[in-house]
Design a protein with these regions (language model features):
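Active-site segments of SGNH/GDSL-like serine hydrolases
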Residues: 40-62
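A near-ubiquitous, low-amplitude feature marking generic local secondary-structure context
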Residues: 20-23, 27, 53, 96, ...
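Detector for Asparagine
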Residues: 7, 16, 47, 60-63, ...
């Protein structure tokens, strides 16, 4: 729920080369962004919620410098960071998994990331796969079926 469905394919032809484009420079986070992050971190901490940082593959908007900055932030706050730009999920292929040449993922790309993230959350962080009630699971299934019927038209 929330992904703009796209099964179109426009390949990104350069593989993971984009991760070398920062020239070794770290990206700077503005004071405003750092303040907002601190608020989120504090809210999670007060409520016993484990905060996890995640970046999804985006060849047109991401680079090594940005990745390094988030990695430093994760280290400073002792957070888990899953960087899918440095480590693409199993089965992910820039030739087939982007809808617009590397900026956004299509359905197959998003599915590869989602499947890998679910495995990491359950294996690495020992999260339970779901705590949905039977009724909630039925509603998700109904919504899922409706979603797929509406896009097949």
């Amino acid at each position: 729920k929330g992904m703009a469905y796209a099964n179109t394919v426009k390949a990104y032809p350069f593989g993971n080369e984009y991760m070398q484009l920062s020239g070794g420079k770290h990206a700077m986070l503005s004071e405003e962004k750092l303040d907002q992050f601190q608020k989120i971190y504090d809210l999670c901490d007060r409520n016993g919620i484990r905060l996890v940082l995640l970046t999804v593959p985006s060849a047109n908007t991401w680079n090594k410098g940005k990745s390094d900055t988030v990695k430093q932030l994760a280290k400073k706050y002792d957070l888990t960071y899953y960087d899918y730009n440095r480590q693409l999920p199993a089965g992910f292929d820039w030739a087939t998994d982007s809808k617009d040449g590397g900026n956004h993922l299509n359905y197959t790309g998003a599915s590869a990331v989602t499947k890998d993230l679910a495995k990491k959350l359950t294996d690495d962080l020992t999260m339970s796969p779901t705590s949905l009630t039977k009724e909630q699971k039925q509603q998700w299934k109904k919504d899922y079926e409706h979603f797929h019927k509406s896009i097949v038209k």
